[in-house]
Amino acid sequence: MRKWALLFVVVAFCRLNSLAQSPFGHYFQDTLKPGYRISGKLDSVDVNLAAYQHTLPGFFNPFLFSFSYSDLNTTWHKPQQRRYSAIPHIAFEYSMGSKLAQFGKITYTQAIDSNTFIQFDYIRNTTNGNLRNSNFERNSVQLSLMHRSRYYGTILDVSFYGNNNQLNDGLTGDSVREGFPLNFQEVVKSNAGNKTKEFHADWKNYISFTKDSLHKAGVMLQSRLDIKNQRYFERDTLKQIYGFYNYDSTYSYDYWELASLRLNGGMFYKNQDFNFEAGLGTRYWDYDNMVLHQDTTEAYGYAALDMILKGFSLKAAANYTFVGANGEMSVVADLGKRFRSNLFTAHASFSRQYPENYQRNYYANTLNYSWINRQLSTKTLGNVHWSSKNRVIPFFAEAFIESNTNMPVFIQNRWRQDTLMHLSVAGIQVGFEYSYRKLLIQSRVSYRESSGNLLPNWLLSGRIAYNGGLFKAQKLKTVTGIEIGYISSYRLMDFAPMINTYVFSNSGRAFREMMKLHFYSQFDLGYFRWFIRIENIEQTFVKPTNFEGLGYPVTPLQFRFGVSWDFFN
């Protein structure tokens, strides 16, 4: 009976943004193992430091295997995973290339003493010229501090994220002009853009009633501040373009901001292989949008579990709101098991949430809508992953499925829940790696099915490279080769810049299937690495008339160069 009661508590109440994370116990094992590098494995440095550049605005990338329908809307900051190191570690990585593309990252990890740990991350990503006058600048700063003593522990997380996008409607014509560079072709609305900013401050405090380091029980207090805002600006003959305006005929400067404060209080229990938290919390939020202003107070229960049992690692959390946004809930669970050279992981989640404030009520220069009724939208997600690092042919296999009901979609200049009632996506991916002497072969195959056919069904890629040392001493290591890929066709989506979201289009136009060809060469000299990458070589041999989205052509030939350096004291 007690086991079922505990399961009910875990599944019924939680409002934590992360799973149970007590500052006491085994969380301080080193995560920066010998051989750790900020740029990852040597054979994929070019991928880690130079994400594929495409012309689509926002974060939607149909060429990546993982996908969620929430990627079509404004995408918010994803915090970095916690790291622990017994010795100070500082690292940076930087890459640059065509279209003024630049990516930089600096990390700092240190155990100040046996009870105090600090982590800092700064990430910057910019580009200019995927289309004329189109660029973005993204900055992310995150600071984490963790401290413990015999009776007290604390976790402090502070982060800021800013995203500044210059936007346009892409090419004015329906086809790309042959014989002209992409960045010299005309565009519409080159003087429009949006800005999103976030600030988060999360402070958890644990007061233990026991001095036994292996068994901790006591009170947990948490306060969290979240601020998000989005702005859109555009200067043009707006009445002629949109047919109406709300406050200015030539200049739009729309904005909304959502600020919220959470206060949680509860109990926790921690031993060597078990960590549990549960309690009650309240949230006050304030929504400000031009002439609109709304605020309310919510109350909820929360719980989180983290345990290890017979080699299985289980992390679970859940929530239920009973005052304010009554009926909102979320259940999430992660299960992992390592067996010799194999690692099995599974993730499942279910949530019921009301649409975002800006989706329900919004006033802008060229938009104006307000919902009378709202419905809870549901999202069900599951994925499994199996990886094997055997000595013969290392491989991995993964699959995922996502189902959404009553998800808000942007149709005819407003968000609606009564049109596309069900949206789902499912995919499976397998890959392997084979090494023979100094020959390295890597390959992966992905297949996906999505509502509306907005994703390519097939994604195929293969890399063949020389993997070995150079010169007599063999201290300079290199992985140099080519990457060949294939992308099947998919339905092109439209983009609404004034609300920063993608729109299902009835144009009937589609991305035409195509082959991909890239060259890469990366080098390792101890803690210092560098790489060069030439991607989209195939575009020099085909007519530039293919599109990734309505008005957004396929990216042409790109050159990339980057370095990384790790410092261990």
Label for each model-derived stretch:
Residues A20-T75:
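N-terminal periplasmic/intermembrane-space "pro-region" immediately following the signal or transit peptide
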Residues N61-S66, W76-Y108, G129:
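Short strand-turn segments of transmembrane beta-barrel domains in outer membranes
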Residues Q102-R124, N133-N165, A201, N205:
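Transmembrane beta-barrel wall of Gram-negative outer-membrane proteins
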Residues R132, T154-Y206, K228-L238, W256, ...:
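Flexible loop and strand-edge segments within Gram-negative outer membrane beta-barrel domains
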